[in-house]
């Protein structure tokens, strides 16, 4: 057995994978797997799959860990019951080379039953990163060892719903939390979605966040048979493998850690069969992200508009996924302190596609420098959980400048008020958005702006007032904590903009989507902005009023409550069509997925976009078709 001290050193990478004996590596992989399945991961999925497990497989391909289903940990009841059906694990491939070997095995098995490679049909689904279970309609079981599992039917009694309101008894699936929901409501409380998912399953009483997630359908049981699929011939899979993987990975709003490929042909599935751990006709492709190791040159504190201090690591210029990386966020100072992120540290970075690079781990910890005072205003910093915060909200220059630039950025109907402009205004005693709206050309020129720039800035201020925007966007621009665009729109679906400052805690809590803790933050936020709001509102902004939910429910047309995406050049301005669609009870999105009901196309739309939409089950209609279904 490994001591806890040794395990901690491996986690911190004081001891690297190549320094472990084979037996130590095997024990650590088992320990990490148990922690993951108990909902308390000790290392990231990427590190487990691509560093530790990959090394173990290379050293000991016949290790028992690769021959049987991983145990699910001690978080579930000791008493196990027989599962209605076997729930095997899935074999994994981490490269095209490994996928090719699986395809070769399919071809050989096909030849034994007279099935040509081109006749083999394949389907692909997202590989969910949740808690596996089996729903027989009466009970829900954990996967356990694949034969016996624990009864966790309590999660349905707590109100957990099934994906797409599909009903019970659909067999194997996973308990997951929507990615968008986690990022909106839970990311500040849980490091990984799996930590939160485990709280839904355990026997202890649910906390407020778990109850809200169930009520909001942010957490769901997803039967595998209800997942969206790609299907096609083996020939097509080989020819378009990367494209298919990219397509399937974004099919659902859940954490996905790969793509599951499986044979459709029944006779071939029967021929290939299974071993003790997995079906031979099925495989999960898990793509390794680009990972580099780089030295940290400096760690600088950055003050956000809310006062949170973000550590920014300056690193040696490094090419990663086609981009040169010189700076990367350290997330918060709690992590800096815990991981030893300091000058001279060696860190592991990853970047997938166009995603912002992030630090996976600190390979070589160094002494850290935790600031005592705000870099901007000099006031002492305080700890709020894992975050260092400057509480000098009214007078901190960085926070003031951040709030002003945020206001104009969120309004999105103006140009010119970026950080350079606002910093110059601040240097001349401009401390609020309301003060900016009192400026004129002469004052701007006296501050040091040229005549042409001054005229343009005043023109942009006038534009921001006259150009129509949604009332919820106007409210969101004030930057209240937890009041982004979505929550502002939700609030204004129940109350008029000028009435919200008199709302009680109870009135906000009664709005669907706002728990008591969020309501408390909203009440405090409204108090903090009311004076500035009144100063700015007097300029009579051209605001589009949000339709109340109760009024939307009186609308009756074919597209009511449907999700649509507009694309291409429209006869009507596309932004106006989006706004009107919302006014008549249509849910407007910007990207195609299986959740979308209709794609409304104008001119100049690529055939590939239309084909992709149709593959996902999205109905395609022209602008004329759309207009005929609603009253414009």
From Swiss-Prot:
Gene: ligA
InterPro entries the UniProt entry points to: BRCT_dom, BRCT_dom_sf, DNA_ligase, DNAligase_N, NA-bd_OB-fold, NAD_DNA_ligase_OB, RuvA_2-like
UniProt KW keywords: DNA damage, DNA repair, DNA replication, Ligase, Magnesium, Manganese, Metal-binding, NAD, Zinc
Reported function: DNA ligase that catalyzes the formation of phosphodiester linkages between 5'-phosphoryl and 3'-hydroxyl groups in double-stranded DNA using NAD as a coenzyme and as the energy source for the reaction. It is essential for DNA replication and repair of damaged DNA.
SMART domains: LIGANc
Gene3D superfamilies: 3.30.1490.70, 5' to 3' exonuclease, C-terminal subdomain, BRCT domain, DNA ligase/mRNA capping enzyme, Nucleic acid-binding proteins
Keyword Nucleotidyltransferase: no
Positions bound to Zn(2+): 374, 377, 390, 396
GO biological process, one term: DNA replication
Family indicated by similarity: Belongs to the NAD-dependent DNA ligase family. LigA subfamily.
Protein known as: DNA ligase
Catalytic reaction annotation: NAD(+) + (deoxyribonucleotide)n-3'-hydroxyl + 5'-phospho-(deoxyribonucleotide)m = (deoxyribonucleotide)n+m + AMP + beta-nicotinamide D-nucleotide
Binding residues annotated for NAD(+), in chain numbering: 45-49, 89-90, 143, 174, 286
Organism, scientific name: Vesicomyosocius okutanii subsp. Calyptogena okutanii (strain HA)
